[in-house]
């Protein structure tokens, strides 16, 4: 008998993957957590029925969250990741030698625990000496921080459950306060096919707080529609004006210095969402 997992991305559309076996399933304090082994994408982390990451395509999301803001900032030393308990963004952040400390605040400790167990190629960097892992509410951590971080990355689930507060204007204002005077922030902002209103709202809210606000995209096969967006807000540095000398060689599978600029070239229907 074949086993298949289907993520219903809308009421009428979804994606499905053949499952070899279930590695772990649990109702945590915050969400339903499933770790499964798939035929096509390797081990897959699922939260509340939504694919969070897979061994096969994880590098796209994690590289684009991390390297776009880190190469935009001239000297990022202190970095905060809100969410991201699978450890993929941390792994990419640590490729930048200027980063002296990376703090990860994940609300659900079970995500960290089982990512370490079943996604070691993604979560292995969580034990690095430059990393501080805190199990707690990222919203509250931001509220308690001021003029502390060079770059803040919000690696959250979609705006449901424990992540709902991470898509509010008040949260973005708190991020601005937590950043230093030339700080940069980035957040995943879902896809333009099924959630265009979210992109419009988030971009508008961020633009009212950050003088430089831009949208960029990446292609991620296991995320709804495959076309994913990220909103970046900066107090001083424009991601489209990064000097050539700032790029240094790091090992990546998706991100390149050419792609850095190309990612901001939006299809017209996506650009229309943020006019």
Swiss-Prot record:
Q: In which pathway does it act?
A: Amine and polyamine biosynthesis; spermidine biosynthesis; spermidine from putrescine: step 1/1
The protein's Enzyme Commission number: 2.5.1.16
Q: What is its main location?
A: cytoplasm
PROSITE patterns according to UniProt:
PABS_1 (PS01330), PABS_2 (PS51006)
- Catalytic positions are 155 (proton acceptor)
**Source organism, top-level taxon:** Bacteria
What UniProt keywords are attached to this protein's entry? Cytoplasm, Polyamine biosynthesis, Spermidine biosynthesis, Transferase
Q: A Pfam family matched by this chain, by name?
A: Spermine_synth
**CC annotations in GO:** cytosol
Subcellular locations according to the entry = Cytoplasm
Q: What does this protein do?
A: Catalyzes the irreversible transfer of a propylamine group from the amino donor S-adenosylmethioninamine (decarboxy-AdoMet) to putrescine (1,4-diaminobutane) to yield spermidine.
Recorded hits in PANTHER family, A to Z, give: SPERMIDINE SYNTHASE, SPERMIDINE/SPERMINE SYNTHASE
Protein family according to the UniProt entry:
Belongs to the spermidine/spermine synthase family.
* Official protein name in the record: Polyamine aminopropyltransferase 1
Where does this protein come from, organism-wise? Bacillus cereus (strain ATCC 14579 / DSM 31 / CCUG 7414 / JCM 2152 / NBRC 15305 / NCIMB 9373 / NCTC 2599 / NRRL B-3711)
